[in-house]
Structure formats: C-alpha cells, structure tokens
Regions:
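Sec-dependent N-terminal signal peptides
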Residues: 3-13
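Thiol-based oxidoreductase modules, predominantly thioredoxin-like and allied folds used
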Residues: 74-91, 107-118
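Thiol-/selenol-based redox modules, centered on thioredoxin-like
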Residues: 123-126, 130-177
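Short, internal strand/loop/helix patches
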Residues: 22, 94-143
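N-terminal "domain-start" segment that seeds a small globular fold
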Residues: 17-38, 123
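Amphipathic alpha-helical repeat scaffolds
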Residues: 29, 49-53
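Conserved helix-turn-beta segment immediately C-terminal to the redox Cys motif
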Residues: 43-44, 53, 57-81, 101-104
Length: 177
C-alpha cells in the first residue's frame, strides 16, 4: 500500500503543475487576506510587478487609468510589489499602500510583496513566466513593471517589457474584453 501511495505521490509531484490553472494559485493581498486567483475567473487580468522607487513608477498613473476605464467591463489590474531589482521597493505593505494611494490614487488591487525570480519566486510568477517567455525565450523577469495580459479563461496571452506604457496595451485589452 505504501508503495502504491509513493508512486501516486511521485506522479502527482512530477505532473501536477502541468495541469495547474492560474485560478488554483493562492495570493495574498496588501492587507494580508489570502485567496485564490479564482476570484478573477471570467475577467481579463493585467498582472504587473511594481516598485515605488523605479524609473517606471509613474506607470502607476497609466495602470490606474486602465483600471478606472475598464474595471466595469471586466478588467482587473493586479499590482505585485517586488524588491528584487536594486531594492526599489523597500517599504512595508503599509508604506506601499500609502505611497500608491497618496501619490497616484491607486485603487486597483495591490498585493503583498513577493519575489518574481529565483527559488523563492511566487507560484503565480513561476506560472506566468512558464506560460509566456521573455526575450530570446528566457523566463527571467528583467525589471520592475513587466506586464502579463491574461484572458478571461486564465490563458496568458502576452508578456510586455517594463518600458511598455500601459496605454500601449489598451488595444490588446479591448480585444479580450
């Protein structure tokens, strides 16, 4: 019996993640509430690793504009703070929340700080990187404000470079709404 259980466990570990859906992944919002991405089922998602002290930080404005314009039509903009790039997100969740709210009027959903690369990379970012490779087929996130567009069925449609302005993604979003 233990042998059969061992084989079952091995097969589950070996092949389990291949069948994983984005909706199975747990996330923690900036206030510490844990839930699965199933919350966003049947919504288009724009998932972005963000930072408060980056040359691209002003993209918060464009992300918020997309949120305000398309939330009611089915878009969820999701911001995941990350401190892996030159420590450009050093604050606590409370610091980040306050900065985003006061400086950019951010109302789109923000999450707890995560790693996007390395062995401690969040499961969501492992999934995103495997689903949509970067330049030359690499998986590594190169910088803050890398963006992933996900359709209503949970399929990663496209990955955008940090330099891509949120307004430049608008047409792709409209095609999915």
């Amino acid at each position: 019996m233990r042998f059969i259980f061992g084989i079952f466990l091995f097969i589950t570990i070996l092949f389990g993640e291949e069948n994983m859906s984005i909706y199975d992944i747990e996330v923690k919002d900036i206030d510490g509430k844990v839930f699965t991405m199933k919350k966003y089922e049947n919504r288009v998602m724009l998932i972005v690793n963000v930072a408060s002290k980056c040359g691209f930080t002003n993209q918060y404005e464009g992300l918020e504009e997309l949120h305000k314009k398309y939330f009611d039509k089915g878009l969820s903009v999701l911001g995941f703070p990350c401190n892996q790039f030159l420590s450009q997100e050093p604050g606590t969740e409370e610091d980040i929340k306050e900065f985003c709210s006061l400086t950019y009027g951010v109302e789109f959903e923000m999450f707890s700080k995560i790693d996007v690369n390395g062995e401690n990379a969040h499961t969501l970012y492992k999934f995103l990187k495997e689903s949509s490779k970067g330049v030359l087929g690499t998986e590594t996130i190169k910088w803050n404000f890398t963006k992933f567009l996900v359709d209503k069925n949970g399929k990663v449609v496209k990955r955008y470079a940090p330099s891509t302005k949120p307004s430049d993604i608008e047409k792709d979003i409209l095609d999915l709404l």
